[in-house]
Amino acid sequence: MAAKSDMTSLSSGLLINELLSNDEGVMGVTNQVFPIVSEPGAKLPYICYRRGSNEDRAVKTLAGADTAVIEVLCYADNYAHSVRMAEAVRKAMDGVSYRYEDEGGQSLVARSIQMTDAEEGWNDDAYMQSLVFTVKINNS
């Protein structure tokens, strides 16, 4: 029997970073993926993501499940590119499951990722697409 992982939905950003950074479609529209904020001097286009909220749900007979809400922001210097980025992110994340494993062998499994909201805007001289995903994490 595998050892219980210490990783919970608080580590979901690590999983999202790996998922987006390893996706060919996403890397085809940008090679810059940042947690929370972009690095100083980052050039458009780029993606930022953050964990917006977290909920733990106990289940009587099974291992519990955490739910994390992840916001992914796609920034580009033109509207069409921002939409292409959003489409690539949605294709990479929506309706998938994903397993992340760190260097120490700890793992985190997103049993389902679902897009729940999206909007667009203008922020810091860039077109922005905001996508919100609900990520259900196995606690095993």
Question: Over which residues does each language-model region extend?
Answer:
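Oligomerization/assembly interface segments of phage tail-like spikes and tubes
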Residues: 64-82, 89, 127-137
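Small/polar-rich, solvent-exposed N-terminal microdomains that initiate assembly or binding
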Residues: 1-62, 84, 96-107
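Acidic-leaning, charged glycine-interspersed low-complexity segments
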Residues: 94-140
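Short, cysteine-centered beta-strand-loop-beta hairpins and adjacent loop/turn segments enriched
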Residues: 56-59, 77-79, 139-140
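Short beta-strand or tight-loop elements
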Residues: 45, 68, 111-114
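Residues in well-ordered beta-strands of folded domains
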Residues: 34-36, 50, 73, 116, ...
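Long, well-ordered alpha-helical scaffolding segments within enzyme catalytic domains
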Residues: 86-94
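Short capping loops/turns at secondary-structure boundaries
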Residues: 9, 82, 122-126
